[in-house]
């Protein structure tokens, strides 16, 4: 039968929880849906999976008005998991943890984020990056820069506010203007492959 997963709560969870470490290690097997995409780093949300949250719905609605928005690859930043690509939001334990999001990062968490970013191999998969992660933006922008990727920090404190969405839309439009067009079929095929590589 289907595997039943209990919610992991902050009092019994640390960076060394076996389910967390397993998810992080398997990120090395994962590949984004296509080559030459733009990495878009967003904040996580209290609601899981993130794409069902009101803030992520607002991000999606703003971005789908942008030409070639399918070439954006959404990755959410969170503790203790680190980085969660959109296609993996249903995977355990990404949809099964309950931890307050503070935006304050300890030295060990920053090191964990650095390692997760390296596992995503951005220099191989992405042509540019946009960081729109609120209180986590500064640290994520620095980590992406360390790897030599061209990155734009939207510098927005409230990412899902009307003003924040407008800024994100404009930056996405400019960033995507010279990025190869990605169609729905190829994107869907790439998403399925990335998920399979991660799970198996």
Give residue spans per PLM region.
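Helix-enriched interaction subdomains in cytosolic or periplasmic regions
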Residues: 1-16
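Polar helix-capping/helix-linker motif
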Residues: 13-20, 53, 161-164
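Conserved mixed alpha/beta catalytic, RNA-binding, or beta-rich assembly cores of soluble enzyme
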Residues: 19-23, 30, 34-120, 177-200
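Glycine/proline-rich loop-helix segments at beta-alpha junctions forming the active-site rim
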Residues: 110-190, 194
């Amino acid at each position: 039968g289907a595997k039943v997963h209990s919610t992991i709560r902050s009092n019994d969870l640390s960076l060394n929880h076996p389910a967390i470490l397993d998810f992080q290690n398997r990120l090395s097997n994962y590949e984004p849906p296509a080559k030459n995409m733009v990495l878009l780093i967003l904040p996580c949300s209290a609601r899981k999976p993130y794409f069902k949250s009101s803030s992520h719905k607002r991000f999606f609605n703003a971005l789908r008005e942008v030409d070639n928005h399918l070439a954006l690859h959404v990755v959410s930043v969170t503790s203790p998991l680190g980085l969660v690509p959109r296609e993996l939001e249903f995977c355990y334990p990404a949809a099964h943890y309950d931890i307050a999001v503070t935006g304050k990062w300890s030295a060990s968490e920053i090191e964990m984020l650095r390692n997760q970013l390296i596992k995503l191999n951005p220099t191989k998969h992405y042509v540019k990056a946009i960081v729109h992660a609120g209180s986590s933006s500064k640290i994520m922008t620095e980590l992406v820069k360390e790897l030599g990727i061209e990155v734009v920090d939207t510098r927005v404190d409230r990412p899902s506010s009307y003003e924040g969405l407008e800024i994100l839309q404009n930056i996405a439009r400019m960033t995507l203007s010279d990025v190869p067009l990605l169609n729905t079929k190829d994107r869907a095929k790439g998403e399925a492959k990335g998920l399979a590589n991660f799970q198996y």
